Every structure is written in structure tokens, then in C-alpha cells.
Amino acid sequence: MASALDDPALQRHFKGHKDAVTCVDFSPDSKQLASSSADACVMIWNFKPQSRAYKYPGHKEAVTCVQFSPSGHLVASSSKDRTVRLWAPNIKGESTVLKAHTAVVRCVNFSSDGQTFITASDDKSIKAWNLHRQRFLFSLTQHTNWVRCARFSPDGRLIASCSDDKTVRIWDLTNRLCINTFVDYKGHSNYVDFNQMGTCVASAGADSTVKVWDIRMNKLLQHYQVHNAGVSSLSFHPSGNYLLTASSDGTLKILDLLEGRLIYTLHGHQGPVLSVTFSKSGDQFASGATDAQVLVWKTNFDKYSVKEIVKLQQKRTCPEAPPHLNDIYPRTPHLHSSSGHSIEINPMCEVADTQTFDPPIINVGANLPYCRRTKAVHTLNKHVRNDNYPTPPVAFSYTEGQKEHPLVEEQGVLPPSLSNTLEQIVDQLNVLTQTVSILEHRLTLTEDKLKECLENQQKTSAHASESD
């Protein structure tokens, strides 16, 4: 059993939302925390002592998801109002609006290079967008029901998604095809994510299960039934050794993936927990729930730092490479039962009260005059489908001593002629890439057939020799 010093501890709690907290996300430098809520607001919490929190009203309905860009300069939010907003996480709170889908937008996620982001919606589609040009790229449409979540792999080559059609799908972005499907007949998944190596995905089931799949072998590696209600969210520790889960039963669970067992059960929220996430360094994690609170925890239980674990992984003689399309083939799944016991931690009683006073909250963009649409926003609206949906102009606050700056740099807008030429080149490259992929696949089939023919020839020769 771990010592008390190794147990997770509640560090801070933030109160500012007026309704359920639907999503939480750390900034890349872990100096800020973003949260979204059913109160239709996004909030940015600053960890610096005595700093103010920013509240961004703008969405017309509940905000379903929020995420920092890899650079930390933007925050994306999705909403039931069918839009996605891109915010500057500062006191000015400028935002750009994208009419993204024809139904509720459930999820938004950035690629690791920050060039692309994806959205998932109740319109049964996943859409990819270019961030800097704010241009719609393509849709993935093989799900047959609401898409709850979509996440990039660490290398940006794959997307994992889960839907109310009771499937978890793996998509190859090169071909824009679904290359693998995991079916769960007991219920749909609410959330899905890749581990840090990109070799496994974990799903949070509405049937209260957590499953970890090897996407190279198409095999169920681990199956946990540790919650008493649906699992709403999960997050891999950066080391890849632990998995944090949140559930409607009001608890957070921490799973040791190396030993395949539950090690901690955390009680802190007064109601269903809707979102959890580790910080980039892994030394903190945050949770949000229907009690409108955001809790920030100190990890403590990971005895190795992320840097040490990365060094250990680099020393391996045969590091695991990311999966290739031809590496993924069907296998019969098996269950992995959890073992061991949990350590109950109740922040109200057993953990020292390290909570800070609620920071002052600044309402950014509320009841402010609208400004004229920027060129970037106007350019965006030309390329987004369903333009008949009215897009509000960008609202921002005026603060003395601060210069106005556009959310997206104007220098990123190219002349139409050059833009069309580049698009044609990109389309041609995509065709070439698909052609090469098809040729590789055919070559593989040909090699397999040739190998089979050679084996048959050897068998025939052997039989002929025996007959003689």
C-alpha cells in the first residue's frame, strides 16, 4: 500500500460556474486551466497567486468541450449551439465563431502540431479544420449515430472516435478511411483517447466499463468494471502507466495499467463527475462535475518523473513503432479482470485542506459593443458549410494600455490566385499519396501470393521426390 505522502491530494478548488462543468483542460505550460460549463460560459483559471479568472460568455447554449491549442495561444470550445469558438485566453477574450455542424457539437481536439483540429457532433460526423486558415477540410461520416468524442493520435496520423452506434472507430487520415472498428454490444462509449505511444486506445463506457484496446493487434488488452455508473471521461498519465477515470457515480478512479488493478478511489465532488485530465507534466490532474466545481489535485503517486520514464523508454532496444495500416488485423478480444483493492480518499476529511479562496472573476465580452467583422472571420465564413446560419461578429473588451491584436494574423491570408494554386497542388499530392498507398497494398498482396506459390512449389517438389 502506498504511503500517505504518495497519495493524491486536493490542491485547489475553483468556483465560478453556475451549472455543471462539462470539460477541463490544462494549458501546455500548466499555468492556466480552462473549463467549460452548461452555463454557456468558458472560464480560464490562472494558477498564479492572487490572479483573476476570466469568464467568457459567448455561446448561446451549453458548452460541451474546451481545449488549449498546443501553443497555448488559443482555446477552442464546442457547444450545443452547433458552433465552435476560438478564444484568445486573456483579458480581452477575443473569439472567432465557426458554424461547424448541423447539430450539437460534442467535442473539439487539436492535432499535436497545432495545424489542424477536429470536431465531433450529433449530426453523426467528424469534421477536420485547418486552424490558421480557419477552413473546413473534410468529413468522416461512417458513424450511424451521435459521435460523442474524437481524438487525434500523438503523431497526428490517426483519429479515434466513439459513438452512440456502440462502436469505437480508428481512422487513417492519409486515406480518410475507417481502418478498424471495435464493437461493444452492451452500450456506447462516452469518451475515447490514445495512450502516449499511440499504440492503444481507452474507452469510457456508458455501461460503467473501461476498456483498453491494442489497435495494432485489434485486441482487448484490459477490461475494468470499477465504477457503479457510466464512465464519462478518462485521461492517460504522460508516463502511460496510469489511467484516470471519471464517472456518474461521483468518483474518480486511478488504474495502474502495468499491474492491471485499481489503486485509488477519490471522493471530492457532490454529484456526477463529467471530466478529468492530467497536466502535460503529469504532476497534477483536474476534474469537473455537475456540482459546478473544478478541483485540482496533486498526483504524488507516480514515483518516477515523466522525464525519467521517457529516458527509460528511449533505452529500449526495440521501441514500439506507431501502427501501420497493414499492421491492424482482426483478433478475438479477451477480458482482463481487475485485481487488488482501492484506497479511499475523501478530500473533505482525510486530505489536508489546501483550498484557496475563490479568485475574483472578470466577465470578458459581456454586454460589450460589437466590433466590425475582421477579415479573418469573413474569410472563414466563405468556406464553412451552412452559411445560412447567422454568425455573430466578434466581441471583445477595450482595456486601456493594451493594443488590439487579431486572433488570427492577417499575414496568414493568401491571395486568391495563389491559394487556388496551392489547393490544386495539395489535391494532386493527395491523389498521388492515395495511389502510392493502393500500390503498396497491391504489392503486399502480390508478395503474399508469390510466397504462397513458392511454398506450394516446394511442397510439390518434396512430394515428387518422395514418389521417386
Curated annotation (Swiss-Prot):
Annotated localization: Cytoplasm, Cytoskeleton, Microtubule organizing center, Centrosome, Centriole
Ranges of the WD repeats in the UniProt entry: 16-55, 58-97, 100-139, 142-181, 184-223, 226-265, 268-307
GO CC entries: centriole; ciliary basal body; cytoplasm
Primary location group: cytoplasm
One GO term of the biological process aspect: cilium assembly
Superkingdom of the source species: Eukaryota
A Pfam short name: WD40
Coiled coil: 420-459
Expression tissues: Highly expressed in ovary and, at low levels, in testis.
Keywords noted in UniProt: Cilium biogenesis/degradation, Coiled coil, Cytoplasm, Cytoskeleton, Repeat, WD repeat
Function: Plays an important role in centriole assembly and/or stability and ciliogenesis. Involved in early steps of centriole duplication, as well as in the later steps of centriole length control.
Similarity section: Belongs to the WD repeat POC1 family.
PANTHER family (alphabetical): POC1 CENTRIOLAR PROTEIN HOMOLOG B, WD REPEAT-CONTAINING PROTEIN 55
Subunit structure: Interacts with pat.
Name of the featured protein: POC1 centriolar protein homolog B
Species assigned in the record: Xenopus laevis (African clawed frog)
